[in-house]
Swiss-Prot record:
<keyword id="KW-1133">Transmembrane helix</keyword>
<dbReference type="GO" id="GO:0045944">
    <property type="term" value="P:positive regulation of transcription by RNA polymerase II"/>
</dbReference>
<feature type="short sequence motif" description="Lysosomal targeting motif">
    <location>
        <begin position="400"/>
        <end position="404"/>
    </location>
</feature>
<feature type="glycosylation site" description="N-linked (GlcNAc...) asparagine">
    <location>
        <position position="157"/>
    </location>
</feature>
<comment type="subunit">
    <text>Interacts (via lumenal domain) with lysosomal protein MFSD1; the interaction starts while both proteins are still in the endoplasmic reticulum and is required for stabilization of MFSD1 in lysosomes but has no direct effect on its targeting to lysosomes or transporter activity.</text>
</comment>
<comment type="similarity">
    <text>Belongs to the GLMP family.</text>
</comment>
<comment type="function">
    <text>Required to protect lysosomal transporter MFSD1 from lysosomal proteolysis and for MFSD1 lysosomal localization.</text>
</comment>
<dbReference type="InterPro" id="IPR029382">
    <property type="entry name" value="NCU-G1"/>
</dbReference>
<keyword id="KW-0325">Glycoprotein</keyword>
<feature type="topological domain" description="Cytoplasmic">
    <location>
        <begin position="392"/>
        <end position="404"/>
    </location>
</feature>
<dbReference type="GO" id="GO:0005765">
    <property type="term" value="C:lysosomal membrane"/>
</dbReference>
<feature type="glycosylation site" description="N-linked (GlcNAc...) asparagine">
    <location>
        <position position="228"/>
    </location>
</feature>
<feature type="transmembrane region" description="Helical">
    <location>
        <begin position="371"/>
        <end position="391"/>
    </location>
</feature>
<dbReference type="GO" id="GO:0005634">
    <property type="term" value="C:nucleus"/>
</dbReference>
<dbReference type="Pfam" id="PF15065">
    <property type="entry name" value="NCU-G1"/>
</dbReference>
<feature type="glycosylation site" description="N-linked (GlcNAc...) asparagine">
    <location>
        <position position="64"/>
    </location>
</feature>
<feature type="glycosylation site" description="N-linked (GlcNAc...) asparagine">
    <location>
        <position position="185"/>
    </location>
</feature>
């Protein structure tokens, strides 16, 4: 079980010594001076047949490699990610086969022998729990309501939201069958954004990104909860690389400038680096302004095989990988029974990175480097000054000659 901490739960499990801080300071500075890697990034909606279909292709070309991210809302929202060792690899789509009951082989990246890594991620269900009279930290975080299957959502035409200036597009959906009218004025959105160089978004949690990743921002806005203290979550499924599920680990930090009071970074790894990864700050927000006061605690369950129950069918995953069934799934839940929550403004937003290669690593921010320099430099200067004073004083005494 991974615990995700909001502002009231931020903590550092160890107290760094001055020598550790000094070594980190020395080791961090050179990496901050390295140049930024860039890629030529294109984003296009691939025209469907006979009607427009939501198939978004991100192609990021580097000096000797190409990354492909293929997003689709055919079935549940899903992405196929592929890395090749050539700058000439292309995506091939067989629409008649893709829209058939058996779409295996409809999606290919060519040449096939250039593929170095491939996997997929599927957002299968929107979860809702009644957290009334539930103590904090309980799992599950309340009585579950029937989940919303994202395969049974109706999605907008993503072409209308395509923004080539920011390399972003938005999938916006609501249930096809909504007898209670919970989504009459609400929607679930997946904003996908690619990057041609390293940087950080302007809004929290300000995840550090490189040209090897795309960012996904999931937002639930305006939907009516089925209880007064509903907590929401997402079920996420991925392909396992062999018999075992991918690993998830936590990284702790002493720097929280970009995500105040959040000292943790979570990663899902599809294998030993460099391979594929999913990376996120363990924090969501209940207000659009995303201030610290609206930060939500969250939890991520351990990954588990899904052989015991069927997952919603994703046509693009089956189109690329065939009939593989070694899926693993985990749940992300946002909020706690007390404190801020979705009930504040009927708003919930969470961000993550999806990438191939080495996950971006936060170096210390200039503010923290400055504080460390002052904290460690001042005692050093005092020590050096004291040593010089004693040396000069000793020299004066050694040069004194008695008049006798």
């Amino acid at each position: 079980m991974l615990r995700c901490w909001g502002p009231h739960w931020g903590w550092v499990p160890w107290a760094p010594t001055p020598w550790l801080l000094l070594s980190l300071l020395v080791c961090t500075v050179p990496f901050g001076l390295l140049g930024e890697e860039t890629r030529q990034v294109s984003m296009e909606v691939i025209s469907g047949w006979p009607n427009p279909q939501n198939l978004l292709h991100i192609r990021a070309v580097g000096s000797n490699s190409t990354l492909h991210y293929v997003w689709s809302s055919l079935g549940p929202p899903a992405v196929v990610l592929v890395a090749t060792n050539t700058t000439q690899s292309v995506l091939n789509v067989n629409w008649s086969l893709l829209l058939s009951p058996d779409p295996a082989g409809a999606l290919m990246v060519l040449p096939k022998n250039s593929i170095q890594f491939s996997s997929a991620l599927v957002f299968t269900r929107l979860l809702e729990f009644d957290s009334t009279n539930v103590s904090e930290g309980t799992q599950p975080p309340g009585k579950p309501y029937p989940p919303y299957s994202l395969a049974k959502f109706s999605w907008n035409n993503v072409t209308n939201s395509l923004d080539l200036a920011t390399l972003s597009a938005i999938f916006r959906g609501h249930p096809v069958d909504d007898p209670t009218g919970a989504f009459a004025n609400g929607s679930l959105t997946f904003k996908v954004q690619a990057f041609s160089r390293s940087g950080r978004p302007a809004q929290p949690p300000r995840l550090l990104h490189t040209a090897d990743v795309c960012q996904v921002e999931v937002a639930l806005v305006g939907a009516s909860p089925r209880g007064n203290h509903s907590l929401f979550g997402l079920e996420v499924a991925t392909l396992g690389q062999g018999p075992d599920c991918p690993s998830v680990n936590e990284q702790d930090s002493i720097d929280d400038e970009y995500a105040p009071a959040v000292f943790q970074l979570n990663r899902l790894l599809w294998g030993s680096s460099p391979s594929g990864f999913m990376q996120w700050r363990p924090v969501a927000f209940s207000q659009e302004q995303r201030a610290r006061e609206s930060a939500l605690a969250c939890q991520a369950s351990a990954l588990h095989p899904t052989l015991a129950y069927p997952l919603p069918h994703s046509p693009i995953v089956q189109a690329f990988f065939g009939s593989q069934n070694n899926f693993c799934a985990f749940n992300l839940t946002f909020g706690a029974p007390t404190g801020p929550g979705y009930w504040d403004q009927h708003y919930l937003c969470w961000s993550m990175l999806l990438g191939i290669g080495f996950p971006p690593v936060d170096s210390f921010s200039p503010l923290v480097l400055g504080i460390m320099a002052v904290a460690l430099g001042a005692p050093g200067l005092m020590f050096l000054g004291g040593g010089l004073f004693l040396l000069l004083r000793h020299k004066q005494y050694s040069e004194y000659q008695s008049i006798n």
